[in-house]
Amino acid sequence: YDVRSSITLESLSGTGEVRLSSGGTLTLDSSSDISFNGIFSGQGALTKEGSNELTLLGTNTHYGSTNVNTGNLTVKGFLGNTNLTIAAGSTYSVEGGDDTIGFISGAGNIHIPSGVTLTTSTNSNTNFSGVISGPSGDIGGNLTKSGNGNLTLSGINTYAGSTTIRGGTISISADSGLGAVPGSATAGHLTLNGGTLEAKASFTLNPNREISLG
C-alpha cells in the first residue's frame, strides 16, 4: 500500500507493507486498539492520533517522521530509523528488544523495559522534555546516544539502566536527567565513548554514577 498524500485511517491490519512515500502522511486515528503485523517503509510521515494503543509487531524500515500526538505507541518489533516526536500525555514503549531510531523530541513518556537498550542516532539537535522511564531495580532500561547531534534531556527521568554517549552530546541541567540513581556505586553507569556530557546548569552528579571512558 503506497501512501503518496495525506491519508487518515481508522484501522489497519495485516502483514503487508505500507510504503510512506516522500510527501505522504498516514494518520491512524481511532479509539480502538490497533495491532499491525506488517511493516512501514519509506521517508514519509506516520502520525498516531486517538486515545487507543497502536502496537507494531514488524521489522519496520521507515526513516521519515513518527508523531505520537495522542494515545500510546507500543513497538514489539523494530520501529526503524525514524525521527520520533511524542506529545505530552502519550507514551512510546520499547517492547521488542534493543532498537535504534532517529531523534527523540517532545514532552511525552518513553518506557524502556529492563535489559533493553534504546539507541537514538541523529545528527540533529533536539530537546526531549518528557520522562524516560522503566522498571526500578539494578537492571533497568538503557539509553545510548550516537550521531553528531545534541540531545537535551530536560525532564526528570526515572529509567534505572545505563547511559552511553557514543557520539554528539547529551545536555542536562540536573542529575535526574540521567535517570534513577543506582543504590551503590555502579561501574559503567555513565559511559563516554566518543561523545560528550554537557552540564547546562550547576549541579552535583551523584557519585554512584561511576563514569567510564571508552
Residue positions per predicted region:
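Beta-strand repeat architectures
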Residues: 1-35, 41-55, 63-127, 133-152, ...
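Short, conserved catalytic or interaction motifs in soluble domains
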Residues: 155
